[in-house]
Amino acid sequence: MSLDLSGAQLDQLRVFAGHLTNCCFDNASLLSTRLWGSAITDCTFQRADLRSSALGTGEWHGHRNTWQRVAFDRANLREVTFTAAVLDDCTFEKTSKQLMFVDCEIHDCTFTGQLSTLAIDGRGHRYPVDPSAISADFRDASVREFSIMGYRLDRVHLPRQEDIVVLHRYPTVLRNAAAWLKRPDATEAERRWSGMFDYTLGAPGAEDSDYCFDLNGYGDPELIAVASRALAHAHGASLT
């Protein structure tokens, strides 16, 4: 199906087993859209309003949502989730806050501009996913409160900013960092933040997977300093 729906009012759109090709949804209002088992190819959602939408909804009758060569540039993707979706050669430019990818396959996608509270979680707790199922380019992105967890990052070009931290085989590194913070001679600040990694360690990804994030996303200067020291010690411990 090929359609020009630019500027259309289509809030709470529901699509089951759809096949959309060469469709234009630029500047459309698509609040709380939901798709199941659908394939979207060569479509544009530039400046579309997709707030609170579920663009990946797991598996439906044996099929997942697939997005191939789709442009989401400057779309409002606030509180949008992709769960167990397959994305191939898609673009995301300055896509607002609280965009989340959970257990998706992400191939050759490009992220640019300011991106805030963007989380890419491949720990496989919602849907099985290969930790190598990601290749993406963030080199022209500026991120805040950003993370990629549970994937291997050898095919990911990360943002060019100094506060990006990359932890290879991150479960081991974080366990070492958590143990260091709880040592008997920890400082008062270290004791105060001793549980900072507990939530992440509560449901870790594969042992050989990675974790990257922007350190300044922690916000609190004391917390940033404590995290930096703990991770520096943990890196040394993980090599011994």
Language-model-derived ranges and their functions:
Residues D154-T240:
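Long, ordered, amphipathic alpha-helical scaffolds
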Residues M1-R175:
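Tandem repeat scaffolds
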